[in-house]
Every structure is written in structure tokens, then in C-alpha cells.
Amino acid sequence: KNVPIVVISGKHLHPDHIHAPNVVISLISMHNTFRAILAMTTFLVTGALSSCNHTDELEPESPAPQIVFLFSPGGLGDMSYNDRILEGVQRFKMENGDIDIYIYSPESLQEAEKIFADWLERPQSSIPVLFVLGSSDYEPMAELYLAEHDLTPNKSILLFESRKQYKDENIHTFQISMFGASYLAGVCARKCSEMTPLVLLANNTDSPINIAKDGFIAGYGSDCDVEYLADDWTGYVSASLAYRKMSDWAVDYDFIFPVAGGSNAGIYRYSREFEVSPYLAGMDIDQSSLSNRITGSVIKHIDQLIYRYLTEWVVTGDMPENQLYGLESGYADWLVAPRYVNDFSSLVNGMRPQAKIFEKEYYETSGY
């Protein structure tokens, strides 16, 4: 029997509370409902189609494995990292219709913490369950609660964008390094920028984006100005603040490297509306179509990676314990925008081997 995808947004519900196995449940209570619906529409349709069956079909002898997915607060609908994750989960679901998938899209870090804590308290069962923490924002939360709770044998955890290695073999982590790709972005900025670039970060506590900052500065070859939109996860949902500040930044800088989330509604929007705008970099996916000032994009093939991890878990019951994926892996890269190919392609191709070397050296010496 095929089962649905359940999207749970803004509600403290658990899979066991739902007793309608052939119904797709969508509880939308996010701040940006329209964008969330756009992000989930294809996913929901897929789940609805896959859940059709005949009334006389027998129930399976054993319960289906479950995957519980906790997206970053306000992340779905970003047309970037989170939506790309969703695409990977959707692909997995289309090929594994017998797996229950429950998606939580919390409105705050506090809500996410409640969902995770409640799940950890659930008793052991015969159903294999994988809980996916789909954001580096959740690393402090995971460390706190996993120090106090042991996983029952049926539970596994996958934590995104973390370098921490846990003693429990059922806790798995990975990080897609942005150092090498950001290094190549910095190389391009050096060629087209006549002023000190601005590195704009969501916050100063998230190690993956600080790694991107270090890579960009290394590629640029000298110091850059650095600004933070917030001191916590809310920096990822501060597009309106970035938009307001762009009027000043457009005067002071001719290249901005934004690792802040929601840039399409902030920085890229400004560059579309005003003729005078700095050169920019896209983030996580190819965003060159969003602004003619985007010179290239730091690419994360997170959709391919999450598909691989989920498939491996279903087939083998296990996943790699702790992995780092950089330029060498193919899961990260710097993709030059089509309109700037003649300006940067040869330069980037020539510097890519050096970027791989510097990325490896960075992790050997930085402590990350």
C-alpha cells in the first residue's frame, strides 16, 4: 500500500496522532503561507496520487518505516536551499511510496525544539524512524538534548551541516563545505570589483556560513567588510531588512556576497528595481535568473545528497556517520552565470584545482 506525505506546519503533532493513512494532511500556519504552498504543491500532489489504493487491498503485515523531517524555521518557500531539499525528498518519495514521510515546517526555533524534544521522549517501538534535522540552526539544540537522551534502538537521526561526530552510531552528520566554491566567488569578485566587497551573513553563530565567508575572503585575496543581519536564526528571514539597507550598500560597495537566506526578496529584488546596484553572488542553487547582477552562484546539490542518504537508510538501515563534502565531492561548486561566462569561465576553471587544495588545507588547520 502506498502512503501519503504529511506536511505539518506550525502545529505540534506527531505521526502517531494521525489516523488517516490515505489522506494528505496540510496544516499551513506559516508567516508566508503563499510561498509555502508554492513550495509544497508538487510534493502534496505527488503524495495524494501515491496514496490511492483499492479498498479491498490488504494492510501490510508490518508497519512502514517513518521519516520525520524538520525544516528550518520559515525555510520552506525560499526558492533556494530548503526548496531544493524538498525536491530531493520528493524524488525519494516517488520511488519509495511505502515509506511514511512527515514534514514539519516550524515558525520558530522554540517550536522546532518542542517537536524534537517530544519525539525523543517517545517510547521504543518496532517501527524504524529517521528524524532529519534539516538545518545547521539545530546543532546546539541537538547537542543539548542528545546529551540528556539516549536513542531507542528503532530511532536514527540525521543532522545537516554539522561536523560533530557522536558516539551513538545511529546519529549521523554531514556538512557541504562552501569554502572552495566561495573561494572561486572571491576570485571573480577580485576581477570585477574596484572597492572592498561586502560579505553579508545571516548571523555570527552559524559555522557553515562563516566558512563561506572565510573562503570568499581567501579567494578575494584581501580583507572584506563583514556585516550580520541578526545574532540568531532570524537573520535567515530578514529579507526586508536587507532590502532597506541596500540603498546604503549600493553606494559603499560594488560587490556583495550574501549568505543570509531570502535574498530574492531582499538584495536581488533591489538589484532588479534599481539600475545602480553592486555585483552579486547567488547562493545554494543557480540564481542567475533572479538578477542580471549575479555573477555566479555557490551551488549545493543538497537534493542529490539527501536522496542518497534516505535511499541508503531504507536499503541498509544505516548511513555514513560523519562526512564533509566539498568541491572534490561534486556536491558543491561555483557556477558562473551565463551572462558572465566570457568574463569568468576560464579564470574559474584555472583556479578550481587551487580552490580544492586550499579547501582541504582550511579544514586541516581551522579546527572546523
What do these predicted regions represent?
Residues 312-368:
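Hinge/cleft segment of the Venus flytrap/periplasmic-binding protein
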Residues 48-51:
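C-terminal motif of bacterial Sec signal peptides marking the signal peptidase cleavage site
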Residues 89, 181-223, 320-343:
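An alpha-beta-alpha
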Residues 174-196, 298-318:
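Hydrophobic alpha-helical segments within soluble ligand-binding/sensing domains
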